[in-house]
Amino acid sequence: MAFDVARLRALYPALQSGTVYLDGAAGTQSPSSVIDAIADAYRRGTSNGGGFFDSSVRADYDTVAARDAVADLVNGDPRGVVLGPNMTTLTYRFAQALSETWRSGENLVVSRLDHDANVRPWVQWAQRAGVEVRWADIDLATGELPSEQYRELVDGRTRLVAVTAASNVLGSRPDVRAISDIAHSANALMYVDGVHSTAHGVVDIEALGADFYVTSAYKWDGPHVGCLIASPELLETLHSHKLASSANDVPDRFEWGTPSFHNFAGVAAAVDHLAALDDAATGTRRERLVTSLLAAERHEMALFKRLLAALEADPRVILYGKAAHRTATVYFRVSGFSPDDVSRELAAQDINVWSGHNYAWEVTAALGIRDTGSAVRASLAHYSNDDDVDRFLAAVQSL
């Protein structure tokens, strides 16, 4: 393996400033290759797709290239990749489409571990459709989402199960495959939020059993583009509320309005960058992604082990969540300080962390901290290094 974090960090202009970016769960920094791809798309001239002239042909090329890249990233079918402004918008779009197939007396299952973007769209459209919403609860001691509870929650009237592949605050990774097996045994669809998880390991939507998988490129070094991946056959069954003049093919029928073609160039560049995190990776782009993301996960978790051990040793620190299987993300409070105070003090030392609920609305309510500022989140990325961890720990200890 050749995962060289020093080599990697040199590729990111933002990392040259000296700032410690422990806010990867909110959005990652972009390497020069992604920035250049987007800038080049502007420089060569921009157009809508579907035309016969060069800039329009290039816009179509960038769209296809982005779909191909996202499909490689998650082991999906490029014909089923829907590109949009963000995961929240796409989820609302598909909640509307799916709700038109629901009937009174049916139900769907959401979880209290999820980001609100994989909760509220389903709850709101279920209410409009007269469909029951059932809740999967977290284990408050560990921050895990026990999969066995789904055997009681899912029945023959369940139409959809929405669950995260990793909590954006606790880092907990549910057993998505076990949950999907239960859902599919009742012929329910699985909608998996991969926004937080995608950057932190290898994704295989087939292995997960995800009928729909959503992710956002800005969480893995790319621009602000949301991605939904499903089988094209499943997409064909869904109605899209769109302009009469818009394409009716899939995935195009779900891509409303004029797309961000220049950002699509950045999506493909970001996936190519991820495939080269380990510069010894060989084979197809998918094979290089697997090698590189495994190496990146090992790197992140080695750093995180040291960071977490130091926080656990500090008697002033209160930690939330201790899942056995997790991402390199920690959610904590420091006795005597509000979460905002901690975040503000670290910002003064040029260390970026987030305080607050981070849209984990149900998680923070279940933990009993939502009304008191929630907690502080520190999240590592593949470009994090020992110095980042050292400076973070020193700053916390200085409080």
PLM regions and their residue ranges:
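Pyridoxal 5′-phosphate
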Residues: M1-L399
